[in-house]
Regions:
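Short, solvent-exposed secondary-structure junction/capping segments
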Residues: 27-28, 61
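Thiol/selenol-based redox catalytic cores and closely related redox-interacting motifs
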Residues: 35-132
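Local sequence-structure signature of Cys/Sec-based thiol-disulfide redox active-site neighborhoods
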Residues: 1-22, 28-33
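Generic structural signal for short, solvent-exposed loop/turn connectors between secondary structure elements
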Residues: 25-27, 98-99
Length: 132
C-alpha cells in the first residue's frame, strides 16, 4: 500500500494536524473520504495493521452517539460495517507511512507521526492539501 492520507478536506482538525506534522513535505497520496469513500480493501488493510476494526472507529462521532452505539455490544464485524457505511465513523486523519499507521487526533499519535516524518515541533509545513 502506498503512503496515503485519509482525511476530510473540510475538517479543521485534519488540516491542523497535517500542517503541524508537515505532511506536505512527503510524497503522500491524499484521499478525501467524503468524496471518495473507503472501500473494503482499504478498511481491511487498516484493521490488519491495527489489530481490529474497533480501533479505527471514532466513538466521539455525532452519528455514533445519536445511534446509541456506545450502549450496544458491537462486534468487530459491526465496526467494519460502520466504517464502510459512513466516513464520520473513521478516526481521522489516518496516515499510512510505510508499515506504520497513525489514526486520529490524540496528541501522542500526532507527535509519533511528526517523529516518523522526521519533523520536530515548530517545523510546520505549508498546510497545502490537494485541490479536489
Amino acid at each position: 500500500m502506498p503512503d496515503i492520507i485519509y482525511y476530510l478536506s473540510t475538517c479543521d482538525t485534519c488540516r491542523k494536524i497535517l500542517k503541524e506534522t508537515a505532511t506536505d513535505r512527503h510524497a503522500f497520496t491524499y484521499q478525501d473520504i467524503r468524496t471518495e469513500p473507503l472501500n473494503e480493501k482499504q478498511v481491511d488493510e487498516m484493521a490488519a495493521r491495527t489489530g481490529s476494526y474497533e480501533s479505527m472507529v471514532n466513538k466521539r462521532a455525532i452519528l455514533y452517539k445519536e445511534r446509541g452505539l456506545a450502549k450496544q455490544q458491537l462486534t468487530d464485524t459491526d465496526f467494519r460495517k460502520l466504517l464502510l457505511e459512513h466516513y464520520t465513523f473513521l478516526k481521522r486523519p489516518v496516515v499510512i507511512l510505510g508499515d506504520q499507521l497513525f489514526a486520529g487526533n490524540d496528541k501522542k499519535t500526532v507527535a509519533a507521526l511528526a517523529a516518523a516524518l522526521g519533523n520536530s515541533a515548530g517545523s510546520e509545513g505549508t498546510g497545502r492539501l490537494p485541490l479536489l
